[in-house]
Amino acid sequence: MNMKISRIHFLCNFFLLNFYIVFSQNKISSTDIYSANFASEKFNSTYSVIKKNNFITLSFDDLNLMDSDYYYQINHFNHVWEKSNLFKSDYIEGYDDNLITNYSNSFNTLVDYKNFRITIPNKNLKFKISGNYSISVHDDYGNFLFERKFSILEEKAKINIEFFKSKNLKNYNSHQNLDITVNCSNCNNLTGSSSQLKLVIIKNNQWSNKIVLSEPDFFFDNKLIYKNISYKGGNEFYYFDNSSINSTNLRIYKTELKDFYNSYLRKDIEKINDTYNYNPDINGKYLINRSIENYETENDYSRVFFSFKPIEIFDENKIFIVGDFNNYEISEKYQLKLENGIYYGNFLFKQGFYNYKYCSINSLGEFNLIEPSFWQTENNYTVLLYHKKNTDKYYSLIGFKEQKSDLIKN
């Protein structure tokens, strides 16, 4: 079936027998896809957890409106996203390389687009095992467009997280420490010479900042304890709200209508590393405007104008905006340009509430968020527990916990 497609940016969704489903960020080569998201009750995000018997839907908008057919494929990975040594039939039941057929045209918008939706599992594809997966999309010539990572959880252990200020005097004002407790009915079955256990931690849905631990600090029959896992606190996210697309607010000082809506943000000034100021955010996530009944197809797009004044010019470094809205993707699609000591950029955003940060990339390709770091900053941490018997060919996901650092102990 032909569908007009070109802008693809993905979202994936799932369920499975006794399994939860966990989603992460994705990789994109197409510049023509916007608003790819998993929609939960609270946020649109690149990361979600779904209990058994629930379906999840991936949604994305194509603004290019060219006719083409698109397909999705599934792959399985280990705990650090290296491809598993498995056949397709080991981890999926049904067909791989399925055509995406569910789409709708935008209605009553200045920016025309098609909204595509994929609900998984479906009649063509179901999942056999837990662990890390990706779903990738390609065109009918086999050209790769984008992929999204996700994980399926078969829960066998409960996880608890506690937050503390750093004990290291050097990092006392800038870092957060996590103590993680894994509760299992018989931890002896998960550890020892006959199997491997891996604990993975990420902050604010960024796989690039993952910490992987192979051994607990303390071991008991029904409990594993991991102590003093250290993260930079960072700072709260910048935000804007273009839900009411032709209105101004605290962050948008001007709007204008040309071929489509333009929204101008107040200048962002780089924060210096002195005093923490509380600024409520949603930890990098975003929320598409839901005051409209058919919000997937009736929300419009506006071009949002950014300006950022750094403390000093970054010489050869390139500056980008990142957040869950683009899966922290580094691409020219969200790059700012330097002019008279200020970085400028303008990018399309669907009506909604957005969190974002500025980051720099140096000549070596090293990624750094442009922000001070405070121990008080509220972040969202995700802990994943993977298990592999020596006789198995894959890592299963047996524990999951997502928690905000809103209560940090001294």
Language-model segments: which ranges?
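Bacterial Sec-dependent N-terminal signal peptides
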Residues: 1-26
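Short acidic/polar inter-strand loop motif in beta-rich domains
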Residues: 81, 125, 139-145, 244-250, ...
